[in-house]
Amino acid sequence: MARKLFTPWTVKDVTIKNRIVMAPMCMYSSHEKDGKLQPFHMAHYISRAIGQVGLIIVEATAVNPQGRISDQDLGIWSDDHIEGFAKLTEQVKAQGSKIGIQLAHAGRKAELEGDIYAPSAIPFDEQSKTPAEMTTEQIKETIQEFKQAAARAKEAGFDIIELHAAHGYLMHEFLSPLSNHRTDEYGGSHENRYRFLGETIEAVKEVWDGPLFVRISASDYTDKGLDIADHIGFAKWMKEQGVDLIDCSSGALVQADINVFPGYQVSFAEKIREQAEIATGAVGLITTGTMAEEILQNNRADLIFVARELLRDPHFARSAAKQLNTEIPSPVQYDRAW
């Protein structure tokens, strides 16, 4: 039987050489606090391309300065950021990988000086700053900032854009009734709470015709929060808008007890793939090639997003191939070892 983990996957005009995706993970390493890439970022991402990862998604990258989780996050709110990202995309592609970027706004989870913003003036927890409720004008401005960030990502040479609508950040905050208590057109019903994400998707697509992913938190793990049924509905709307893949994570909107085990989020990807009829990515404690192959062979997801295991092992693709008794190409410089 062919090893599906090492088969290509094509979305629009982008072909990823295998099904392994480096999930976006914040490195908090923009030490000049200007949102720009540092030498560490170049080494970090390029090394995973050398390690034969099919698609590398750059960590949550803020569309405005107050949209950062911390002041050491990456940013793409200025044309000054384009040059660094262009160098990164060129080098990653030179090693045979595709590269995407996750566009993000931290919302009420921003840990910054000055005002922070959210759909409603509800802090993340008792220790967190209370955000200012966004005005309609600020919402429209933020949507335009996502659009401008997408245009910069295109100029920098990215293959794929992912919108971050998970983990309790701004887009997720609009979606969930736990964090969105608005009474205007951006709050209340499912349709209204989806409006911010939906309008952002439309704005991004005005300047971006490449593959578009959205990361979601498929469950808030608490009463009156979002669950998988809600996200199946949202995924259907995203598909209608032209989103190509749903990256299925979960949690982090509020403090919650989560039963974590290997592959604990895979069922979310499976259900959305089946019921919304859209491609999905599975993520969360997927640490072996055997586990990844099972997910793909049973059509539970289309791509495997690997996070911490790729921090531990930049050559995860090689390790997975050995586990699956299959051969994959190696960088010519590494032939003597592989």
Swiss-Prot record:
Family: Belongs to the NADH:flavin oxidoreductase/NADH oxidase family. NamA subfamily.
EC number: 1.6.99.1
PANTHER family the UniProt entry points to: NADPH DEHYDROGENASE C23G7.10C-RELATED (PTHR43303:SF4)
Originating species: Bacillus velezensis (strain DSM 23117 / BGSC 10A6 / LMG 26770 / FZB42) (Bacillus amyloliquefaciens subsp. plantarum)
Positions with a binding annotation for substrate: 28, 164-167
Any one GO BP annotation for this protein: response to toxic substance
Residue numbers binding FMN: 60, 102, 215, 307-308
Keywords, ordered alphabetically: Detoxification, Flavoprotein, FMN, NADP, Oxidoreductase
Function: Catalyzes the reduction of the double bond of an array of alpha,beta-unsaturated aldehydes and ketones. It also reduces the nitro group of nitroester and nitroaromatic compounds. It could have a role in detoxification processes.
InterPro entries: Aldolase_TIM, NADPH_DH_bac, OxRdtase_FMN_N, YqjM-like
HAMAP family: NamA
A molecular-function term among this protein's GO annotations: NADPH dehydrogenase activity
Cofactor(s) in the UniProt record: FMN
Catalytic activity reported: A + NADPH + H(+) = AH2 + NADP(+)
Superkingdom of origin: Bacteria
Stated name of the protein: NADPH dehydrogenase
Top EC group: oxidoreductase
Assembly and oligomerization: Homotetramer.
